[in-house]
Amino acid sequence: MLKSQKGIGKPKTDSSNLGLEISHIRLIFEKAGLKEISVPSLLTASDLVDLYGEDLKLRAYTTSDPVKGEQVLRPDFTVPILLTHLKGKSLQAKYFYSGNVWRRQSFESIIPNEQYQMGFEFFDNKKNNSIALDVEAYLLISTILSKYRAHSVTGDVQILTSAINELDISEYKKASLKRHLWRPKRFMRLLDLYSRQTTSGRNIRLHKSTTLLPWKKKLREFKSFEGVRTKTDIKERIEILEQELSQGLIANSERNFLLKLMKFQSSLSEAPKSISSASMVGGSFKKAIENFELRVGLLSEHVNTKIVKFQVIYGLTTLEYYDGFVFGFQFDNRNYPPIAQGGRYDSLCSSLSKKGKSISAIGSMLRMDFLGKTVTDYRD
């Protein structure tokens, strides 16, 4: 059994077993028709800052180059592979990759700061093919891990974002809530702030007087600014916040529905029926549920969905840019991180794509450092 490790040390992986696993998985990928792709270990930081924001510096290792500017050690494969794919002519592709990624970890984490990953990315330009590719991605990981005693958990970010889209609030508030879905504490603070249940007129005035007005005064005193935003940008942002806090707040019933939805969990087989009976009946939410039902139906033809878990908010703290179907595989011992995770990231494709290139994508990664000698006890 793998003992809990602190700090950034690697799990003690048997190199021979790990080598066999890598060869085995590579063979599975090749038989499935995937093409190997390589991307640099050192990336241009600006390409990732637009995605992660300044939080990137808290998660990744950055350095400054006198010629190339700010650089970052590869924190994952998805974004650099997507950028590489977008430079090509083909819209459809199925890639697999292997190599190291580097991420800062907390002292208590058992995930090494340098870890070896394998995985894949599917790109497609046919909108009606997304659900089939979701299922294909899940089954590919399921096949790889079939010899291990691992259980899977699934989620669907689209259900939550579509529910937010149906709220009777401004587009600014909707975008703000969706942007912070992956940061639960920030999201809940925003939800409380935008909610009529927790934010009275007095509290709004108090919030404005204690956090916004002083900044207006201080803004006049600043002579120089660091960062991307200009003085005008900051001033406009303060004015927008003032306006948003004074009108169109979230109704109690909508807030309660959203909170209930975020707590929902069941077996995958029971989830469609339970969620479809919800009171939110807007078009966006209905479409998300229809897609969910189709995906579960297709998955049920290949796996026992009664033993697959479903949580609406699964992966929100770790799968930053996923916006649809998400999944993970976990060993029975909950002290370990998910051995594999993946999901759909169409919005990321849309934001990084050039005009005329409308593509969707789903991908998954495997933590190979946990598939060596230290996990042999988990095999059947």
Where are these regions (language model features)?
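Short, conserved phosphate-binding/catalytic loop or strand-edge motifs used
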Residues: 114-119, 155-162
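Polyanion/phosphate-binding surface patch
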Residues: 40-71, 106, 111
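Positively charged, Gly/Ser-enriched RNA/tRNA-binding surfaces
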Residues: 2, 14-33, 37, 43-44, ...
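Acidic, His- and aromatic-enriched active-site or binding-groove loops in soluble protein domains
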Residues: 57-67, 169-199, 331-332
